[in-house]
């Protein structure tokens, strides 16, 4: 069975550019609808895909936050090289953490962290997430249940150094959130079981900018960009971007 894997995308629009960042074990499909929505309203949108994502899970464990941050910065530099001077960043989960890191690393017009963790529930929760991703990917490849079980046994023997590195990244970003002066719109799903939702309050309270807002989405889970309130999220993100001083 030919597996069609998501790829980076660029939707060319006007002079205002938005870098869209997906989550850990996710891919650009997580932010594609948001990208289309913003592009239809005049924005240029670019979404990099992190190394080791959208490929067999065996490849994921050989990459880490440093690789993914490089992919994010390459995405930012790509927009710059295409002539976009004004760039906002909008990210889901780990992508939201990266959007905050961009906020104190390079000039950013506005930041939208969506369901972004400021501390991880536990390494075990993350590990279960990786196993679930691996199992689903193998199903997606059309493998038999027996083959999947066999491959999963092997996969579970692989050291997951990535998870510790991810925790370190999140801790580092949390320590620097008070260096963010760009307007920030914190998006958080009420029924988010992947992260500690207190993270949203931490981000909102600690960013240094006065131009900030926090909105809770009462009907949504962690992948808020694909959940039942996604249309509202699209609209709210667009309205936030429209108010920025481009």
From Swiss-Prot:
Listed Pfam families: Hydrolase_4
Gene Ontology terms: cellular component: membrane
Keyword Signal in annotation: no
Catalytic residues as annotated in Swiss-Prot or TrEMBL: 93 (nucleophile), 192 (charge relay system), 222 (charge relay system)
Domain of life according to the entry: Bacteria
Keyword tRNA-binding among record annotations: no
Catalytic activity of the protein: a carboxylic ester + H2O = an alcohol + a carboxylate + H(+)
Key words, A-Z: Hydrolase, Serine esterase
Gene3D superfamilies xrefs: alpha/beta hydrolase
EC number, as in UniProt: 3.1.1.1
Gene Ontology terms for molecular function: carboxylesterase activity; lipase activity
InterPro entries: AB_hydrolase_fold (IPR029058), Esterase_lipase (IPR012354), Hydrolase_4 (IPR022742), MAG_DAG_Lipase (IPR051044)
Induction of expression: Constitutively expressed, part of a 5 gene operon with multiple promoters. Not ethanol-stress induced.
Knockout or disruption consequences: No visible phenotype.
Quaternary structure annotation from Swiss-Prot or TrEMBL: Homodimer.
Family as reported in the entry's similarity comment: Belongs to the lipase/esterase LIP3/BchO family.
Function: Involved in the detoxification of xenobiotics. Shows maximal activity with C6 substrates, with gradually decreasing activity from C8 to C12 substrates. No activity for higher chain length substrates acids rather than long-chain ones.
Protein name: Carboxylesterase
Organism annotation: Bacillus subtilis (strain 168)
Gene: est
